[in-house]
Amino acid sequence: MNVNDCICVGAEPIAFVDYLAMERTDPRIAEEIGKGLSRGAEMANISIVGGETATLPDMIRGMDLAGACIGYAEKSKIVLGDKIMEGDVIIGLGSSGLHSNGYTLVRKILKEKGFSYSHKLGNESLGDILLTPTRIYVKEILELLKNVDVHGLAHITGGGIRNLMRLNKKVKFVISDPMEPQPIFYFIRKEGKVEWKEMFQTFNMGMGLAVIVPRDEKDDAISILEKNSEAKVKEVGYVDKGRGVDVKKFKLHYE
């Protein structure tokens, strides 16, 4: 998650520190967390340069895991979204699932409906689906930044599709052909009776990252992303006059 935020301003992640606080020491859980952090650092091509582990039974229930990422960018190449203009194209990169957002709502639904984490959704258990690691987009975005005039990058995390508005409040982002959400999102909507508008402003709904580029560089951008990413790459919309975000298929508008 941290490295994905870092690349959204055009910065290359270079280092990471982690912090793990536990109610009681559990070597097995700590080992699994360490493996995950190591794998994530490898995928992002960064070093874990430090961290802290604490046992705090008076303050923590379960555990608290946090981290911080440091990145580098030349000042003249920082991506702020101020170059976004009418006619630009929005390209989506597929997510791997929930991406660490909306879990409070998911746990509430599972508890109220009596679902166990072993409950099958398709060929996978809910537990395995919820533990699917967040997709890391560092490699493909750094390659894209070298070759295309990227106007904006949005990490679709908490806040969902509304995160596009953080890039530029003077235009309207139109999602005309959204990515297909994974089955877990349909499950959440059905079992929790959650409206589409709430779903799209809480979850990534299948799109983990949005890239905004000039229309005349769209084909090059898609080609570079497809060659360097494991994620599905798709043109999902465009930038228009107005303000906010439209998701046309679901007749949604956010301001």
Predicted regions span which residues?
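Glycine-rich anion-binding loops of enzyme active sites
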Residues: E12-T104, Y238, K248-F250
